Structures are given as structure tokens and as C-alpha cells.
Amino acid sequence: MLSNNIDRTPEGVLTFAGYDVTQLAKEYGTPLYLMDEARIRANCRMYLQAFRDHFGPGSLPLYASKAASFKQMYRIMAEEGMGVDVVSSGELYTALSAGFPAERIYFHGNCKTDADLAYGVSQGIGFFVADNREELLALEKTAAEANVTQKILLRVTPGIDPHTYEAVSTGKVDSKFGAAVETGQAMELVKLALTLPHLDLRGLHCHVGSQVFGEGVYQRTLDIMVPFLASIREETGVTLSNLNLGGGYGVRYTAEDEAIDIPARLAELAAYLKEETERLGLPMPRFLMEPGRSIVADAGMTLYTVGSVKRIPGYKQYAAVDGGMTDNPRYALYQSRYTVYHAHKSGSLERFDVVGRCCESGDIIQPGVELPGDTCRGDILAVCTTGAYNYSMASNYNRLPRPAVVMLTPSRIYEAVRRETFADLTGLDL
């Protein structure tokens, strides 16, 4: 099986986090998002322990909210001692409404509105991660009006190609995010920020991309970022104390994907950071990273019911399910690979394209999936590793209600997000 929280009973029925998924589908309906809470907590603890073991005082992993944002997720993050990053006032509101400590929240985004800035300042969040000149000036004005000094990091682009999907590659010079080190724009913004009396520039942020497997990507990022910290000290006399390398560690979506030893990677990264800062005479910074996918992806599974099977002789076979791009748009966006299991049959395998119910030819969950040849209407299919960027990217296209999110623990099963109703679909209509 793809992950050790997935198994089969002696009768061949698929289990997830120890539970029979066919029974979960029967009780809660489909499509259905399942989340293994124990796995989420274990992934948090893995990061937290590695940070305690290898990085300096105050260093902290921040959960990247965009991976999966709902109130119970923030409660778990708070209980485990994580920080979080948010990229909108909506994510910030959700975190605060769940009781997440404001001082452990970092507000990202390349186009924060005046309302975003005012809301974050009014709530006393820990840091804004400033992206551009206009934001710096607007945030200075907002902080001055509130008579506070707001801590910030400055987002810069180090010019690193992580060799991942183009749509999730964010650290190259021409990225829409941050200011480029190579062009001198990052240094200009550092100098501007240091002149603004109501902003307290504490450090730098960068993020090179998502689903990163290469061993040297973060070391190459440090090759840019640490000398840039040294250049800032040389040109301004200021030693910035925080360095945030963003997120991006890859996860296994298929058997072909590498299984990354994240604690070992973090130990190597910490050693390299120590070596580079000592070489340039800099103190070891307070270190931050922003894991999202590697916290929640393998804690998720989505269940579907097959609605029809269509065979086109000489061409292909389709298994159409009761969800699709509305609950998982990632294949439609960038052809993301997934592992799909039949939940309760194990006969002779045939190749099917698993497709959704939306009125789009591109509504594909996964092409070329090997399923039992007798797959038919009413069968349950399970898509693995859907904990990240499925619920959070879901939509109501074709007026389809979004699925429930059901949390699984060793002692209980509970809904974290209820299934939407038709009344919800029209609840905002006038």
C-alpha cells in the first residue's frame, strides 16, 4: 500500500486509519473527505522535534493553511504547538475563530488589501510577510494609525528553480511573489523597510516551490539567502535575526515517488545553515519553515461512488464517479498524479480513466487507473493522499455541494466540516 495508514482486511476491504472505508461511505455518504488525525499530529511532532533538535532557540515550523483550512485543523495546530501562515483575511478569521494564538500567525500574500492589513494589525498577529513596496507603505500607514509597531519579514525571490510543476514554482527571479535578490530590488525594499518607523523588519522569507524532492534545493537557496543577509548587514549595519525558507518538501502520491526522510533532510539543512552563517560571521538565525502538504497530504483520502462504467472498444474505458474537479481540481490544473484503489473488489485488473461528473471533458480525477474489470455502478473507489489542496481548492461548479470532512482517530470518528446542502448553495443568493 502507498502509506502505512492504508491496509486491507483479510476479506480484501480497504481500510484507512484502521477503519473500513466502505462502512464510512455508507454512514457519511460520498464524495467524502477522510482525515487521519493521528497522522496529522504525528507529522506536526516530526517537524517540531527536528526543529528542537537542530535549529536555534525560537525556531518554529508554521503550518501552511492553504493546504487545508478549517477550524478543527487550526485547533490541532494550536494543540501541537505549531505556528501557522495565512494568505487571506478569511484564513486569518478561521484561525482566530478556532482560538489559534494570534502571535503565532504569519500573514502572507502578494496583494494584501487595505482591509487585510487593518484586520491583521487589529488582531495583533505575530508577523506580516511583506511582499512589495506598495504593501510596505500601506502597512506603515495602517500601523501608524493604530499606534503600533508591526513585526514583518520581507519576501524575496532567490532565483532558484526547484524543478517541480511550473504552477507551483515560486522562487524564480520572474515570480509574481516577492522581490528579486538578483536585480537589487530586494535590497531596495530592505532599506525602505528599515526607514519606516512603525514596521520592525526582523528577517527574510522565501519559498522556492512545492513538491520538492531534490536534496540540494534548500542548500542552494541558503547559498543565496545567507550571503544576502551578510550583504544587508554590510550595507545597513542591521543583522536580521529571522530566516524563513517556506515549505515545499514533496510527498508520495504514487509508488514511483520518492519517500523523503524529512528529519534527516532538516538535520542536514541545519548543519549547512550553521556552516554558512559561521563562515560569514553571522549569528545562527531563528529559523522558520512552512510545511503544508507534508503535514496533511498523507493524512487524507477521498471516497467516491461509481455512477457509470463506459467501455469504448478499441479506445478506452471510463469509470465515472459522483465527485470530480469540484472536490479535487488538481489533475485539471496541472495533471497531478494520484493512487486510486478499489475499496472492495480485487479481480482481474483493467485500465480505466477515473472521471468526474462535471460538464467538462477535463474533469478527470486520474487517467489510466488499474481497477478490477467488474467495477460497476455502486462500487466505492478511494483516492489516496488527498489531505492537501483538495478540500481547500474545492468549488461549487455545476452547483455541486462540497463534501464533508470526517476526522478519524483511534477512539472516535467525527465530522470536522459537514456536507453542504442545497440550501447552502442558495444561502447567499438574493
Feature locations, PLM:
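Flexible loop/turn segments at secondary-structure boundaries
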Residues: S69-Q72, Y93-T94, T113, I160-P162, ...
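A charged N-terminal "starter" segment
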Residues: M1-K151, M187, K191, T195-D200, ...
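Active-site loop/helix belt of alpha/beta enzymes
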Residues: L2-S3, G159-S308, L371, L400, ...
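Active-site beta-loop-alpha junctions enriched in small/polar residues
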Residues: A64-F70, S89-G90, N110-K112, D131-R133, ...
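Short acidic, glycine/serine/threonine-rich loops at helix termini
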Residues: M73-Y74, S97, L117-S122, L139-T142, ...
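Charged (often Lys/Glu-rich) extended helix/loop segments that serve as interaction or gating elements
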Residues: E268, T277, L282-L430
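Structural preference for beta-strand elements that scaffold enzyme active sites
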Residues: L60-L62, G81-G83, A102-Y106, F127, ...
